[in-house]
Swiss-Prot record:
Its EC number is 5.4.2.12. SUPFAM superfamilies: 2,3-Bisphosphoglycerate-independent phosphoglycerate mutase, substrate-binding domain, Alkaline phosphatase-like. This is 2,3-bisphosphoglycerate-independent phosphoglycerate mutase. PANTHER family: 2,3-BISPHOSPHOGLYCERATE-INDEPENDENT PHOSPHOGLYCERATE MUTASE. Catalyzes the interconversion of 2-phosphoglycerate and 3-phosphoglycerate. Monomer. InterPro entries: Alkaline_phosphatase_core_sf, BPG-indep_PGM_N, Metalloenzyme, PGAM_B_sf, Pgm_bpd_ind. It comes from Francisella tularensis subsp. holarctica (strain OSU18). Gene3D superfamilies: Alkaline Phosphatase, subunit A, BPG-independent phosphoglycerate mutase, domain B.
Length: 516
């Protein structure tokens, strides 16, 4: 039986690869990238928007991987949880939310404690501290007597040592309301792992639940100062408990815990530790009988209340490909695997018919500047094999390097990561052109394009709001058809080159026109 070889359309998402003309600590521009340079000169290209209102975020808010992949995969501007929650606060309906009211009612009924856990940060990527402050005010208004904040510290979507301002704000608010205090602090490295480093999660869980930690101090500010003295920036603060009047706070039966992060991927692991009856990733003293509420849905398998449940979009790129009987592959290493699957499919866990997935484990290193190539070699090997197989109509892949190494603030390592990616792109280009396929290269947001803040001269570990590239590599003649494009225009462009009709739910526009 003759096997029909498919001409693959490949979407390569270079996570954290923004565009900037500045060469000031720009790891992308200053790296040695002969393949990228030649592609940029030879093939049709443009720059598109990956942040702010154009991706459903508040004005001037930097984009992120979750938001980026949702917008790309859905082919429309998807208004994000941050925007929805901000709107609820603005319209004064946040305190009327059924799940939040139930968590508070549980505390009042049992004369127990309310615990808020989450990333205390103005970063706006995984959480926003203003949501936490609003929750504290609502708790006071509704009659809560004892509220304890377990603060995860950022230093990744914010400057590495910037938590003091947020801690002072939280401390002052709690003190002014005579409501409680910050009961524990820890870096997001521990509480917000997403790579199955359960030893990290265990330390955070034990500090929050059992008041069991390597360090105990009299205030959150003292804990932060001592962490800095140990040369631990915000992200890496070792889980620490705070003692007030000789008292350490534990989470007990009948308490309520509200998780204030709105982004799912880094909130899942510790949520399972709180809620799973048969949890076995590390020992717990007991399975707590608590009301556990999450701001958004982190995982459909979690047994908890959700304040802002997801709205499932229809006719995403994956669904349209399935309806047209096309085969598709999603591939990434662990750090970005949820993004090319769950987020790309608009918050859908299940695979579509005809959708295969390949997960490449991320390297087990403390920080990725220690291994800037990460798992890109293995990802590329699998990608080239998939292209050569002729099995797939469409492949979506993510390279994590420019984002994950960019987050370390290590400029030299970021350049090494970019240079390695350039070699990977060369292999993909050769394979696609050999098989008469189509390749689009883009990014979900910027990061490695600014490794040092020019104003402060300090490491810049957060995302940027710079535009991102969108390049077509293939044998078709293509012309830019859309100025000022955005991430939601990518899916319509892929459908266009594949000859598939765009559904009405996709409001994006094609970026390139192709000669028939």
């Amino acid at each position: 039986m003759r096997i029909i070889m498919k001409k693959t359309t490949l979407l390569v998402i270079l996570d954290g690869w923004g565009y900037s003309d500045s060469d000031y600590f720009n790891a992308i521009k200053n790296a040695n990238t002969p393949t990228w340079d030649s592609i940029w000169q030879e093939f049709p290209k443009t720059l598109i928007n990956a942040s702010s209102l154009e991706v459903g975020l508040p004005r001037s808010q930097m984009g992120n991987s979750e938001v980026g992949h949702v917008n790309i995969g859905c082919g429309r501007v998807v208004y994000q949880e941050l925007t929805k929650i901000d709107k609820a606060i603005e319209e004064k309906t946040f305190g009327d939310n059924k799940a939040i009211c139930a968590a508070i009612d549980n505390v009042i009924k049992n004369d127990s404690n309310l615990h808020l856990i989450g990333l205390l940060s103005p970063g706006g990527v995984h959480s926003h501290e203003e949501h936490i402050f609003e929750m504290i005010k609502i708790a006071k208004q509704k009659g809560i007597k004892r509220l304890y904040l377990h603060a995860f510290l950022d230093g990744r979507d914010t400057p590495p040592r910037s938590a003091e301002k947020s801690i002072k704000k939280a401390d002052k608010l709690l003190q002014d309301l005579n409501l409680g205090y910050i009961a524990s602090v820890c870096g997001r490295y521990y509480a917000m792992d997403r790579d199955n480093r359960w030893d990290r999660v265990e330390k955070a869980y034990n500090a929050i639940v059992n008041a069991n930690a390597d360090f105990i101090y009299d205030s959150a500010l003292e804990a932060l100062e001592q962490s800095y003295a140990r040369d631990q920036s915000d992200e890496f603060v070792i889980p620490t408990c705070i003692k007030k009047d000789g008292h350490l706070v534990k989470v007990q039966d009948n308490d309520s815990v509200i998780f204030m992060n709105f982004r799912a991927d880094r909130a899942r692991e510790i949520s399972h530790a709180f809620t799973d009856e048969s949890f076995d990733h590390f020992p717990r003293k007991k399975h707590l009988n608590i009301n556990f509420t999450t701001l958004t849905e982190y995982d459909s398998k979690l047994k908890c209340a959700v304040a802002f449940p997801p709205e499932q979009p229809i006719n995403t790129l994956g669904e349209v490909l399935m309806k047209n009987h096309k085969t598709q592959l999603r591939i990434a290493e662990t750090e970005k695997y949820p993004h090319v699957t769950f987020f790309f499919n608009g918050g859908r866990e299940e695979q579509f018919e005809g959708e295969d997935r390949i997960l490449i484990p991320s390297p087990k290193v403390a920080t990725y500047d220690l291994q800037p190539e990460m798992s890109a070699p293995e990802v590329t090997d699998k990608l080239v094999a998939a292209i050569n197989s002729g099995k797939y109509d469409c492949i979506v892949c993510n390279y994590a390097n420019s984002d994950m190494v960019g987050h370390t603030g290590n400029y030299e390592a970021a350049m090494q990561a970019i240079e390695y990616l350039d070699k990977c792109i060369a292999r993909l280009k050769d394979a696609i052109l050999e098989h008469d396929g189509n390749m689009f290269i883009t990014a979900d947001h910027g990061n490695a394009d600014m490794m040092v803040n020019p104003e402060t001269q300090k490491p810049h570990t957060a995302h940027t709001t710079n535009l991102v590239p969108f390049i077509y590599v293939g044998h078709k003649k293509a012309q830019v058809a859309l100025e000022h494009g955005k991430l939601s225009d990518i899916a319509p462009t892929l459908l266009n080159v594949m000859g598939i009709a765009q559904p009405k739910e996709m409001t994006g526009k094609t970026i390139f026109n192709f000669e028939k």
